[in-house]
């Protein structure tokens, strides 16, 4: 079987040492983090890596922009919390994790991520998935022990996140001394026509249907038009990259087929 990081539909699960933290937005105009969150959590559970997830926060866009109304932004907080809690409960394994609303629970979120940073070492680094604006990462780095920053790696795939901070630039994040881990734009293969997810929509297992529903909520969202007809879990490509090896041969351009293979493999062996 081919096991290169670019080709196979049956990726080898070989995560690097260390823990993972995910910071997502979802309250910004683009609703893609709804599907991205559901897929990210399902991937970690399906590969028995849920215990390595030590922080998850959403709604990290701290300053609302005019492109999304106050009412619509308020809705997104609830939708993102549902994507987190609903996926976690249905798929299981996240009972000891709190899913933070970064904007509404700002102090708690920063404290929790700082704690994860401070627990880092050469043998137990922290991989931070930047699935939204960098501000929460910046605040947590500023509040944590400087000598621990060398053991922090920040994974990114798109400048739209890097450059969207209201308080921190991408360069200011790097200036803390963390390691930048940049992979290609995951929208290429993971923002697709929604018909490519009909297998999930029509799945016999309600856990998979729920994941599909989270992505569908983004498709029918009325704030932006560019998600119409699409099913987008692009940020989850960074999690796929991590669980398949990260900087040691991880899948750099994840596909729907690879996600499907992993999730259906788990569901077939773990019936409700």
Curated annotation (Swiss-Prot):
Q: What domain of life does the UniProt record list for this protein's source?
A: Bacteria
Q: Where in the cell is it found?
A: Periplasm
GO CC annotations?
Answer: periplasmic space
Q: What induces it?
A: By ulvan and rhamnose.
Keywords from UniProt, A to Z, are:
Periplasm
Q: What is its main location?
A: periplasm
Its function? Answer: May be involved in ulvan degradation. Ulvan is the main polysaccharide component of the Ulvales (green seaweed) cell wall. It is composed of disaccharide building blocks comprising 3-sulfated rhamnose (Rha3S) linked to D-glucuronic acid (GlcA), L-iduronic acid (IduA), or D-xylose (Xyl).
This protein is called Uncharacterized protein P22
- Source species of the chain: Formosa agariphila (strain DSM 15362 / KCTC 12365 / LMG 23005 / KMM 3901 / M-2Alg 35-1)
